[in-house]
């Protein structure tokens, strides 16, 4: 038999032969085993002595042993249990039939709508769009929220962050964006949320309409690996539709809990904790996910909104700081504005869209800049105005701001069901600033 044919037959034999090992050591977020040599990223499973199974992903590969992090919890596993190699890398189902469905990061449907009929399995970890293959962001992406469309205009293929403390209104705003945008496909990743918030988000924020949506869900009680890869799985679904030439809205809530999942994994692997206990891998994970969004030449686009939970409303939080450095804009929600009854509570002075000036007309740019200037003057002199120390006529520009204060505040307030077209937002701005 020729040497080449023998080599091929041997390769086929070893590919088809099951590879077994055994558990040597079990820790809270990592299991060590030996018996074969998998690569980092391979998927394995434990066959427990009680007959149940636990699937995991290899995160440590050494000469004598390997370590993997479980997707589900490992109660009942013990040293000596059999470990079986399953496949190289994690894949996730994609296809148009995912629209209207809710899945977990293992690709299992959790919506009681029957078996999922998918087109193919796509790799969960892919490389971001090459820099020179990225299309220029030159089209407006309207979201139906007038304070964003008018003052923080988004572009098709832009990546933005929504930064806020807990209970300020991130989910409500994300629901408004999802319903108000004109993108034909919406992919939503709910990572680390409380279980009760999932049906609430579907019924209250999406109004029960999932016809153009795909939801990937990993709740707070799921393992760190589920919470980590839930975001990557959702991005793979968005990339599938982008590669079909479609414009996709990608919504993720929240980046902070995604990073916290990697913090748990990294600390279990012995990484040194740095700022606020986050290991280096937690910060380096953010661009790996976020840079996969964008606009690609001769294909579609992924316009992404990532919510960032700011602990104690501290915008210098390491995750918030890292996210701001990667994203093309940031929308900051203010707890103070909620106290004044302004919803959505967007702090337009602390927020920015880095592409806005390039995608709207010069007249629209002038309107947005003038509104922000007048609003900034009001905030700067708010105390003087309140106590009556400012005399009208001392500053012409501040006089104009005071006269238009009620109209400007009215512009920033919007009922969550009163979404409006992009052109209407600028018409209202022009009327205020006449």
From Swiss-Prot:
EC number per UniProt: 7.1.2.2
Catalytic reactions on record: ATP + H2O + 4 H(+)(in) = ADP + phosphate + 5 H(+)(out)
GO molecular function: ATP binding; ATP hydrolysis activity; proton-transporting ATP synthase activity, rotational mechanism
Gene (UniProt): fliI
Name of the molecule in the record: Flagellum-specific ATP synthase
Residues that bind ATP: 164-171
Main location: cytoplasm
Primary role: Probable catalytic subunit of a protein translocase for flagellum-specific export, or a proton translocase involved in local circuits at the flagellum.
Organism of derivation: Helicobacter pylori (strain J99 / ATCC 700824)
């Amino acid at each position: 038999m020729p040497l080449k044919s023998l080599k091929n037959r041997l390769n086929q034999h070893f590919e088809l032969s099951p590879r077994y090992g055994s558990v040597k050591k079990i820790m809270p977020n990592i299991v060590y085993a030996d018996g074969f040599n998998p690569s980092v990223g391979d998927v394995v499973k434990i066959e427990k002595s009680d007959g149940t199974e636990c699937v995991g992903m290899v995160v440590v590969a050494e000469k004598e042993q390997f370590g993997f992090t479980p997707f589900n919890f490992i109660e009942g596993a013990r040293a000596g249990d059999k470990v079986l190699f399953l496949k190289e890398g994690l894949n996730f189902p994609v296809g148009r039939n995912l629209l209207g469905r809710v899945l977990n990061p293992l690709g299992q449907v959790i919506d009681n709508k029957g078996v999922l009929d998918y087109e193919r399995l796509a790799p969960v970890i892919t490389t971001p769009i090459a820099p020179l293959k990225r299309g220029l962001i030159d089209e407006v992406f309207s979201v139906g929220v007038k304070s964003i469309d008018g003052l923080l205009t988004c572009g098709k293929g832009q990546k933005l962050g929504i930064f806020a403390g807990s209970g300020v209104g991130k989910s409500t705003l994300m629901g408004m964006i999802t319903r108000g945008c004109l993108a034909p496909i919406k992919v939503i990743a709910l990572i680390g949320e409380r279980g009760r918030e999932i049906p609430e988000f579907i019924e209250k924020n999406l109004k029960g309409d999932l016809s153009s949506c795909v939801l990937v869900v990993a709740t707070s009680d799921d393992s760190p690996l589920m919470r980590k890869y839930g975001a990557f799985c959702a991005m793979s679904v968005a990339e599938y539709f982008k590669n079909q030439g479609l414009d996709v809205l990608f919504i993720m809530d929240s980046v902070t809990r995604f990073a916290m999942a990697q913090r748990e994994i990294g600390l279990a692997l012995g990484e040194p904790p740095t700022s606020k206990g986050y290991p280096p891998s937690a910060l380096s994970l953010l661009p790996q996910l976020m840079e996969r969004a964008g606009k690609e030449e001769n294909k579609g686009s992924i316009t992404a909104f990532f919510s960032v939970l700011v602990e104690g409303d501290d915008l210098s939080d390491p995750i918030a700081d890292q996210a701001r450095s990667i994203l093309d804009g940031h929308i900051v929600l203010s707890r103070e504005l909620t106290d004044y009854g302004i919803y959505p509570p967007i702090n337009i002075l602390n927020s920015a869209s880095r592409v806005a000036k390039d995608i709207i007309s010069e007249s629209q740019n002038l309107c947005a800049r003038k509104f922000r200037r007048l609003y900034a003057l009001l905030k700067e002199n708010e105390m003087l105005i309140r106590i009556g120390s400012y005399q009208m006529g001392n500053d012409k520009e501040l006089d104009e701001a005071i006269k238009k204060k009620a109209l400007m505040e009215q512009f920033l307030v919007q009922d969550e069901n009163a979404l409006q077209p992009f052109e209407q937002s600028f018409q209202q701005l022009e009327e205020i600033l006449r």
